[in-house]
Amino acid sequence: MSQDLKKKIREEYVRCAASPAYFMRKYCYIQHPKRGRIQFNLYPFQDKVLTLFQENPYSIVLKSRQLGISTLSAGYSLWMMLFHQDKNILCIATKQETAKNMVTKVKFMYDSLPSWLKEKQKPSEDNKL
């Protein structure tokens, strides 16, 4: 790998670490029910929720369905796992299937990342990333 490429990767890594919104827009893909794998484009209100998550680690979001908050939470969880390894992520839901769905979203995003953004070792348990 050339020094130029290493420098670009290092700069991009630092940029991703500094901004979860940038990381999600640039490198996260989601599974759309009709269009398949698509880039995760944040809506303006999702940017606001993301800022809320960053400024208030214990956030409660009153929301309606189909706003993409679960997907946003999955992306934020992935960002935290990659760039804040001193943190633990716990997913609690009303049903086990809902929690498993969140883990599936995170895994899908993780699997779509470029290799230089992925962790070197991946846990073997199905409910962990």
Where are these regions (language model features)?
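Phosphate/NTP-binding elements of NTP-utilizing enzymes
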Residues: S2-L129
